[in-house]
Amino acid sequence: MKRKIAVSLTTFWTILWLVPGVFANDFDHSKFDQVLKSYVDEKGLVDYNGIGENQQFSLYLQSLQDAKVEELSRNGQLAFWINAYNAVTIDKVIQKKPKKSVRETGFPGLWTSTKFFTSPEHIVANRQLSPDDIEHEILRKKFKDPRIHFAIICASRGCPPLPRVAYTEANVQTRLEEETKSYLNSNRGTRINRSKNTLYVSKLFDWFSEDFIQKSGSTIEFMRPYLDEEVRHFLDGKPKISYLKYDWALNAQAPLKGE
């Protein structure tokens, strides 16, 4: 009898250990959630001036600094780093005040600089990180989930619209599915040109092709389950695939104050 109880307890604790998040604390993203609901419009355009004056956003950034991410479940960590990328990017726009694009070089009309993304200016989880650090060294390397490319927002009109809700441990998988499907069926994600028998797809599938190939064997096979029936049917005719020009224009509702 004692042996059966011991075995049962061992099984019980083993199951609990394997279930994601049983012992993990969820990080509080409610302040960021409220900011997104208040300052992002239905098109995903951002009121950077309003966010810059919002105390809740400042408090959220502070909370990211000493976060113990290792105590979160895998989904909790994924949600944390997506939100951290988006929050850091928003704050960099507020601090840098680009006029038309985060890739401005100082030469009118020339948008080629990557310094905005590569310069580590924020403390997140006790590390000084840049947006590129979060994207390439953490999200891509650790999670190997190409859907993150439709969740992290580069403050530009070519990237997916910034959602009006923060990611959480509970919603991250559902939200990733929704954002991927939404982007791929928008004009930013895919466009059909029947006269040229060409499907134009987002430049994201060129830049990060290895991520999609690793996941699904090819970029098209990754896309297929998310596409509307019209686009899937067009793909059956084996059209030419070309890439859309990426729009690096700032995703701001209005010019930033203090420019």
Predicted regions span which residues?
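Interaction/scaffold regions that mediate signaling and macromolecular assembly across diverse proteins
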Residues: 26-259
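Positively charged n-region of N-terminal signal peptides that target proteins for export
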Residues: 1-4
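Bacterial N-terminal signal peptides
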Residues: 8-21
